Structures are given as structure tokens and as C-alpha cells.
Amino acid sequence: MDHVPALVLAGCCFLALLPGWACGLGSMSSIAVSYGEDGPVFCGLNSDGSHLVACFGADASVLYGAPPNIPFLGLTAGDGFVCGLLLDTRQPYCWGSNSYVKSGVPQPMVEGARYSELSAGDNHLCALRAAQDGGRGSSAATSLIDCWGYNMTATHAVDEAVSTVSAGSVFNCGLFARNRTVFCWGDETVSGVVGLAPRDLHFQSIGAGGYHVCGVLENAQVFCWGRSLEMQQVVPSSAIGDGDVNIVPMDAMSTVVGGRFHACGIRSLDHQVACWGFTLHNSTSPPKGLKMYALVAGDYFTCGVPAETSLMPRCWGNSGPLALPMAVPPGICVPTACSHGYYEYVNHGEVGSIKVCKPANSRLCLPCSTGCPEGLYESSPCNATADRVCQFDCLKCVTDECLSFCLSQKRTKSRKLMAFQMRIFVAEIVFAVVLVLSVSVTTCLYVRHKLRHCQCSNRELRLAKSTAYSFRKDNMKIQPDMEDLKIRRAQEFSYEELEQATGGFSEDSQVGKGSFSCVFKGILRDGTVVAVKRAIKASDVKKSSKEFHNELDLLSRLNHAHLLNLLGYCEDGSERLLVYEFMAHGSLYQHLHGKDPNLKKRLNWARRVTIAVQAARGIEYLHGYACPPVIHRDIKSSNILIDEDHNARVADFGLSILGPADSGTPLSELPAGTLGYLDPEYYRLHYLTTKSDVYSFGVVLLEILSGRKAIDMQFEEGNIVEWAVPLIKAGDIFAILDPVLSPPSDLEALKKIASVACKCVRMRGKDRPSMDKVTTALEHALALLMGSPCIEQPILPTEVVLGSSRMHKVSQMSSNHSCSENELADGEDQGIGYRAPSWITFPSVTSSQRRKSSASEADIVGRRATDGRNVGSSIGDGLRSLEEEIAPASPQENLYLQHNF
């Protein structure tokens, strides 16, 4: 452990008890920004008080590395990485691509150590230990600070109590708790921050930048020191604007943050932003007239949380994200009451007051504003629940704004008076109406009483009875038919709500684009991350509306673990939008054929086959369990999405249609689909059956095995079917395997999958297997790939079974077709198994052994090659023998009815 004198050490960021919420290059707050060559990323805690983190930006390592279910107290960030202080253990946890700050809990880590603050520089992280017993934490006389990263990995001891720390690029500075003086340590070769630190000034807070430090003094003035003029050594002078970071504004500030060569602060008077220092010529200016709650600085850009109910951050500068479709809290929740000079923040939204801190004993404290601008007076002082309120002094108006406000106040008073008079007038009218009605009712009752004594003729009585009967009959007709009312699962959103969630459908939030629609990432007001599919406005509005309602109707009916879940929709004029669950890992196409080669390598054989099994289960549900069956018509790798747990979901039902109750009966439909995946029989003869989806899925299986696109003209044989099928039939399985991955030690599983793919892409639809048999064969192959015989393979530990208490016993029935002796032996070994219905489970690798056998499609069960060709190799024999291993996958009909009705 290093023992550092009081003037040579570091620290972090100021918490809720310090003035304002600000975050320099890497100080801790509820928001943080990473930067670097892979692009900027904005991360923030959710505004719902869950303490979960959400990120938005360009760096994939930070976006996909963010833990979705781990709560954090606060965040900090540096060059290509983000760190957070874990809410439960109070230890740091990092993610990203920085080579000096590794992902996970930094090591070495003192056992049992707990920390109160974090601070990140360009390539290092420092943490201030919390005061605790046992000698592992800070005390009233000594503070311990642990650092990790480039030239920083060490534990430092300070002879006094340290209240806050803040990290720059290659140095750190902190404040002593006793006298609020500053001390610094680290590499000052470029900045000179350590030697220039003012030892006789007292600060409320500090914010370290790249090569300088700025702080808010006790009189709310800003003081900066350092050598940011040396930036010309890093950035070409032709790209730099004018300004010196040491020339600070004279306004009183509540918070200050530091970027690479600039600084920004929030003015105490009006909570607006002021920035100074060097900027790049193409930088955007800070927002004018917009109040801010909190700030965070990257290298050449700054972001802030505006004082609006939406709490959607804004950024300015260079290279940073401009619009962020996410809501974040303006600070960190603390378990103590707000001290003097602070008030508890509550978000007053459209639906009422929303407390951003969930625990009842925690709160978010913001600093009170000081004073009022010229021409205004303080009508309400700052208290524990609200900031001070300033109003115009109508007796001393000198500006047009003041005159307009005072005139509106007079009009408001006049309207209130008129409203009061109107209420009196309405009350008088109501009294008169009630009086007239009372007299009328009294008169009617009197006349009716007199008429009772009159004798009516028989004709009049019959007429009265006939009228009464007709009235009762008409009443019966107008009763609503309650059976016609339908309950939809999909929620209806307003266009404004979805536009706000996606940042105005900006290009930054666009995650995909097709021929007929664009997909945007958005965050709803409750913090839910969604994908919004927006239809491209077409000239044929009627056709576009038909496809929209078709997909909406289908997804509202369907419910399966491996079909994309529809959350809601919006139909506003010509705008048609569908809201889905957001799939964090994109599509299978992006992994197999995207520009990032690392995505393809991460998709190992086990994960690829698992995705194939899960997609097959989804299509099997459409064909076998939906009533009536659904034909997708656009099965392809770009329509198989992957969620954050790497589970597959079948998506895009815009071209889907309802099939006949008998899945073998063809429909006469014009061809629709994607080139390379389209069934040749459907294309030529216009015969559409569920086997058309089987052909498309066979192409996807070939993509998974080979890593090649369905149609890739850079190869001599551009069509994947024409290239792969002859090689598979010849037994040359190595020739089609993706060269990016090493082949498994046992190729039997991949041989089975290749054989299934060949059968799926047969020219005649009746020669192809059904999806239940394809699913069974793929599950056999997955069991082999995982290292156990498919008959004895248990359910994988990672398999998630929903409603497992509803598992059913299914007896194995022998096939009506002739089988070999080995097949008979296999049938005896299987015995009785258990399987949850497919519409409530994720796929099981052993479910194929537990399905009821079927003899409806003899081409797969027990079928032998009849063309007389003999490959002569053991590989060819192994591929042909797979035909005997594919069995039907559908459960019994009574099980389906039992679980659905």
C-alpha cells in the first residue's frame, strides 16, 4: 500500500450532498459517457428508480456489454469503457473494450472492501473506500483509495478524510473533508495540474478535465488551473476554435465539468449552461434558454439532463450523440434527508408526480437556486420539497416579457371573475329549469290520476297492448351481441409517444431498414426498450394498410416463446407503426453476414444449432398449433432475431397468410417472398403450402452451416442450394462448413443437419419433410453436438421450461413402416418420456425422443434412397441413415386442445 502525503492524492465525483450533479471525464453520477475510436456511448440509470442501466450510442462493446439486470448506485466512464458502483456490494463493475480496465470487477480487489465513489480517467479507474470497521475501509483520520489501469494500479492512503475525488486523463484530484482544499497526484508531464494546484483556496466541488481542473469556490465562483494550451500537440491547430479554459465566466455556478480541452457549468441563477475553453470548429453550441439539472462531459462533447418532465438528455459539441431516446434521473438517490440548501426532486409528469427513487427512505436531492434575475422577485423560497420560485414584479416592469406576463395575469384574474359570475348565472338557469320541470311533472301526474277513472274502449286497449309488445321486441333487437367484442393483447400507442421514444425517428436510433419499413430503437416513458417498425409511406395506401393490419392481426393471435412478441401498434393517418420487444443482438443475418467478423466467430456451432432448433420450434407452432395454420412466406436469416440471452425469435409477419385447416391442401397465391429463399414450386405453379416455409428454412440451415448468403454473386455458384446440395450428397461435408469456425471433433451432428437441409430444399413440396419432423431431427443433432447420445441426452441445464408442472407423459408408438433392427432397438430403449407442450416451452434437445411417432410422411421415416447410387463411403452412409432418424414432432391433438381451450 502506498502512503501518499495529503497534497499528493486523488478522488471521485460529488454525490447528492455536494452542489449539483456534474460529471467530468469520468466522475460518478447517474449518467456517464464513454468516448474513443469506436464512437461515443451515453449510459444512464433508468428513471423508474430500478437502478438498472441503459446505454445508447455507437460502441458495440459498451452497448452489448451493459448488464441488463444488475442495479447500480452510480456510473462513470472513460475511453471505451463504463464502470458502475454495484448497489448491493458497493464494488465497481466495468464493461467495454479498454485494454487497461478489464470487464467485470477490477482486480486485484481487497476482500470485503466497499466503496463510496468511483472516478474514471482515460485508461484508469479509482475508487474511494467507504468508512467501515475491520480496518479495510477509510476512517476519520485516514482515507484509502484503490486505483486500477494504466500506470495507476495501487492502493493509496491519505492522512486526512477525503470527501470527493475526480479523475482527469492521466491524473487525479480530490478535496479534503475538513477544509475543502484540493490535492492532486499522477502524471503532470503535459498538464502540470499537480504542481499548479491552489492549496489555499476552498472549493465546494471540482471537476477534472483532460489536462485541467475546474472547481466551484465557496463564493460560487469558478477557478481553473492546468495547461490545456498544450492540446495543439494532440489535435491539429487548424481544427481548434479560440478560447482558453483558464478564462472562466464570472457567473455564479452550482456545478462544473471538464472535457478534454473545455469546461461547462450550470449557472446558479437560472440553471442554464455556460461553456468555455477550446472547441473544434464544427462543434455545436450549448442549448440556449434550456435549464439543466445535471451535466456529464466526454472528450470533445458534453451532455446534460434538461429540467423537463421527459428527462431525455441533450448533447452538444463534437462527435457526441445529439438526441437520446431514453429517460434518466438527474442524480443519484441517497438514503439521507436533503440538507439545508437542497430540495427533494420529484418528476411532475402528465399523469401526476413520479418519484424516481423507489425505496421509501431514499430521495434525490438537488441544490437550491440562488437569487432571481433582474426584474423578478422571489415569490416562494426554496424548501425541502421545491426550489425557489421567481416572478415578475409588475410594479417595476421594464421588459416586454414582464409586461406580457403581467397582462396575462390580469386576464387570468378577469377570467376567474367571469367564471365565478358564469357559475352564478348557470345556477340561476338550473334553478329555473328545475322549477319548470317540477311543475310539468306535477301536472302530468295529476292528469294521469284523472285518466285512470276513464273507461277505455276494447280497441284502445288492444292498440296499447300491441304498442307495448312492439316496444319490448325492438328493445330486444338493440341489445349488443357481447360475443362480437374482442379483447386484443396489443396496446395502442399515440404517434407522439412513439416519436418521443425514438428521438423523432432520428437516424441515430435507426437499427434496421427494409424495402417497406424502417426499424427504430426507442425507450418508452416507463423505461421499456422497444423496437418500433415504421412503414415507409407508399403510393398504394390500400395495400400498405392491408399488410399492416395483416401483421397486427396475426401477432395479436399468436403467442410462442420463439415468435417475436408484439407490444402495441399505432395507426395515425398515413402513419402505421408496430411496437415489438427489442432484440438486443439483432438478426441471424447480421451475425452470419455482417461487417463485424467477431459476431460471426461468437456464433459457435452449439449456438448456431440452438438458434436453428428454436426457429424451427417457432415455425412448427405456426404450422401445427395455430388454428387455422399460418404460412409465413418470408422465412430468412434476417427475419430470425436474437434476444439478449441468444434465444431466436421468428419475426416479420407482413406477408403471412392463414392456411387451410388441412395443411396439405395447396392455396393458389401469387408468389411473394425474398429471392434465394422462395420455393421454386410456389414460384412456378403458384401452389402455396406449409412446405414452402420448409424450403425457406432449409436455405437458412445451409446459411448456418456454410456462413454463405442465400445468393452471393461473388462466388461462381451464387445460389447456395445449387452449390451446397451436390457437395452434401457426395459426402463432402467439410467443403460446405463455415471456414471461420473450427469443425467439431465429431461431425455426426453437422452431417444430420446437412441431410435435413437437403431434404428441405427438394424441388417438389410433397418430397420435403414437415416442420415437426425437421424440429425432431435438429434436436437429435443438437443432442449429439452437446456430447451425449440423443436417446440418453438430458434436458440441458440452460434450458428454460415455462410451466414445467404441465409436463405430459407420451407413450412411444412404433412406426407402421418397416425399420431396421437398430431402429427397433432404439424404439425399445426410448420407452416413456416427458415433454412440455411446445407453445409453452423453449426447445428441449431431447424432445424428439418423447414425441409420438407418425407414419404420415414416409419419405422421412424409414425411407431409403431409390436412385441406385452408392456413394461407398462411411460419410455417405451416415448421411443417408439420417432419413431413418427424423420422426414427427407434434404432440397429440388432445394435448393441444387441453392446453389451448
From Swiss-Prot:
Residues 33-330 are annotated as: 7 X 36 AA repeats. It is a single-pass type I membrane protein. Gene3D superfamilies: Phosphorylase Kinase, domain 1 (3.30.200.20), Regulator of chromosome condensation 1/beta-lactamase-inhibitor protein II (2.130.10.30), Transferase(Phosphotransferase) domain 1 (1.10.510.10). The active site is at 634 (proton acceptor). The keyword ATP-binding applies. The chain crosses the membrane at residues 424-444. This is Putative receptor protein kinase CRINKLY4. Residues 25-423 are extracellular. It catalyses: L-seryl-[protein] + ATP = O-phospho-L-seryl-[protein] + ADP + H(+); L-threonyl-[protein] + ATP = O-phospho-L-threonyl-[protein] + ADP + H(+). It comes from Zea mays. Residues 505-712 form the Protein kinase domain. Residues 845-876 are annotated as: Disordered. Residues 445-901 are cytoplasmic. Glycans are attached at residues 151, 179, 282, 383. It is an enzyme of class 2 (transferase). Homodimer. PROSITE patterns: PROTEIN_KINASE_ATP, PROTEIN_KINASE_DOM, PROTEIN_KINASE_ST, TNFR_NGFR_2. Its main location: membrane. GO terms for molecular function: ATP binding; protein homodimerization activity; protein serine kinase activity; protein serine/threonine kinase activity. Sequence repeats lie at residues 33-68, 72-107, 125-160, 162-195, 203-236, 253-287, 292-330. ATP binds at residues 511-519, 533. Belongs to the protein kinase superfamily. Ser/Thr protein kinase family. One of its GO terms (cellular component) is multivesicular body membrane.
